[in-house]
């Protein structure tokens, strides 16, 4: 674009607690060393293309409010190139290491799949050229298999195998572009992989179709030499009444059933967790416990609303517990913190995009530093070890190691003087302890 979009022109930098009114980081000092790694390398922030650059500000009761110049015109590819110019300027101003995108975020759909793929490859060429002189890299790419009307009954789970085939072609193109751009992961989100009513749904058939589709993606990943994991993103509902990737536990069962645990991990989102009736902390902790944690879509939902509001993450105590869980198990590998979040409909100034990201990056940094302090002090890990210390002893190890039968345990329980007593869970103490850090 020839016209300047953002008022800001200087990349946002760390200024500390005395920062003035201009955009600045008060907590996010990217070069600060925490547990031997730079804060930037721990948090691995990514800006998402769709909410930041594609969303027009509409809702079910009203149309667009943002009036982005690249949303209007007669040349769709020219609009896509203009959008890319603003995107990479946003990445530069925020000084983020990563971005993410869907295929149709970046390039317009054509009259055929072949035309859509050609458009995507042309914009990928542009991305490649821009990345050659920029800091930003690709955290992950994905294909949009939920917006077009052909996918109203799903993509992989569609009753029509021709639509399954079309979706396969779309994913192949998106996966190959992700690989070409050096993407570190590839995401599959099944927004329409579910049902509206069981009256017209064959559950077993659709689950088998979904398992086969993900297996095909894994096979192609290996064929082209893509080394990153495939990530599935749990969500219980919206847009469908019930989605097959309901939550972490459901996804784990699906991956185990179709022998996909080796190659597929999970991309977990806060707003999706609360829609499933879980806390963000629960979903991350369970994914870590089951060995399927991959990455985070960091945002927040409104606890009083029953839909995906995708607000920017600002809840430091909530984030601190999540980061404590991740840091305690070694931190991110290929994953990161993707801002799957959108500014509010009334936030119509272009620089609102900058303020939103800066505020959320600072909240994440503040939470991460608190998590590191808690971990260093053993604030939560020491009480946890104490709570389960019996299982680290000889008898606990013997039980878990298969050296005791049910009869062995029953005989011991029936023995004289065997009267184990409960101990306090100390929940209130632990909650107050967390508050000392956040």
UniProtKB/Swiss-Prot annotation:
Top-rank taxon, per record: Bacteria
Record's subcellular location: Cytoplasm
Positions that bind Mg(2+) 1: 233, 269, 297, 340
EC numbers, comma separated: 5.3.1.5
Note on cofactor: Binds 2 magnesium ions per subunit.
Disulfide bond positions: none
Keywords assigned by UniProt, alphabetized: Carbohydrate metabolism, Cytoplasm, Isomerase, Magnesium, Metal-binding, Xylose metabolism
Reactions the enzyme catalyzes: alpha-D-xylose = alpha-D-xylulofuranose
GO biological process: D-xylose catabolic process
InterPro entries (alphabetical): Xyl_isomerase-like_sf, Xylose_isom_bac, Xylose_isomerase
A GO cellular component annotation in the UniProt record: cytoplasm
Binding positions (Mg(2+) 2): 269, 272, 308, 310
Broadest EC class assigned to this enzyme: isomerase
Cofactor or coenzyme needed: Mg(2+)
The UniProt record lists the keyword Transmembrane helix: no
MF terms in GO: magnesium ion binding; xylose isomerase activity
Active site per the UniProt annotation: 102, 105
NCBIfam families noted in UniProt: PRK05474.1, xylose_isom_A
Subunit structure: Homotetramer.
PANTHER family, per the entry: PTHR48408, XYLOSE ISOMERASE (PTHR48408:SF1)
Family label: Belongs to the xylose isomerase family.
Annotated protein name in UniProt: Xylose isomerase
Source organism of this protein record: Bradyrhizobium diazoefficiens (strain JCM 10833 / BCRC 13528 / IAM 13628 / NBRC 14792 / USDA 110)
Upper lineage: Bacteria, Pseudomonadati, Pseudomonadota, Alphaproteobacteria, Hyphomicrobiales
């Amino acid at each position: 674009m020839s016209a300047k979009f953002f008022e800001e022109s200087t990349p946002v930098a760390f200024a500390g607690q005395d920062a003035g009114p201009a955009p600045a980081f008060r907590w996010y000092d990217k070069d600060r060393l925490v547990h031997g790694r730079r804060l930037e390398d721990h948090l691995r922030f990514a800006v998402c293309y769709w909410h930041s650059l594609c969303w027009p500000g509409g809702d079910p009761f009203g149309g667009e409010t943002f009036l982005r110049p690249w949303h209007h015109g007669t040349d769709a590819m020219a609009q896509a190139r203009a959008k890319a110019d603003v995107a990479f300027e946003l990445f530069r101003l925020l000084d983020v290491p990563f971005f993410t995108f869907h295929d149709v975020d970046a390039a317009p759909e054509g009259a055929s799949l072949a035309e859509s793929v050609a458009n995507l490859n042309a914009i990928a060429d542009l991305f490649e050229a821009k990345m050659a002189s920029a800091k930003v890299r690709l955290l992950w790419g994905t294909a949009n298999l939920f917006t077009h009307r052909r996918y109203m009954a799903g993509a992989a789970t569609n009753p029509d195998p021709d639509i399954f085939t079309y979706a396969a072609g779309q994913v192949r193109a998106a996966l190959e572009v992700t690989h070409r751009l050096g993407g570190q992961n590839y995401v599959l989100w099944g927004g329409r992989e579910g049902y509206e009513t069981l009256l017209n749904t064959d559950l077993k058939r659709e689950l088998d179709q979904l398992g086969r589709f993900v297996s095909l993606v894994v096979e192609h990943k290996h064929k082209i030499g893509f080394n990153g994991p495939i990530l599935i993103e749990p969500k219980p509902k919206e847009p469908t009444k019930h989605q097959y990737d309901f939550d972490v536990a459901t996804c784990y069962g699906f991956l185990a059933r179709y022998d996909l645990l080796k190659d597929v991990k999970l991309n977990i989102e806060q707003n999706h967790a609360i829609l499933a009736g879980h806390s963000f902390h629960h979903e991350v902790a369970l994914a870590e416990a089951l060995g399927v944690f991959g990455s985070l879509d960091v945002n927040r939902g409104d606890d009083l609303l029953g839909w995906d509001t995708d607000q920017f993450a600002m809840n430091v105590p909530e984030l601190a517990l999540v980061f404590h869980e991740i840091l305690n198990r070694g931190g991110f590998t290929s994953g990161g913190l993707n801002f799957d979040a959108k500014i509010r409909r009334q936030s119509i100034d272009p620089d609102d995009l900058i303020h939103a990201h800066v505020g959320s990056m600072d909240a994440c940094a503040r939470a991460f530093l608190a998590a590191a302090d808690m971990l260093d002090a053993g604030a939560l890990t020491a009480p946890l070890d104490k709570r389960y210390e019996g299982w680290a002893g000889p008898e606990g190890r013997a039980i878990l190691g298969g050296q005791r039968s049910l009869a062995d345990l029953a005989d011991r329980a029936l023995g004289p003087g065997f009267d184990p007593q409960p101990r306090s869970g100390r929940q209130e103490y632990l909650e107050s302890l967390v508050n000392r850090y956040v």
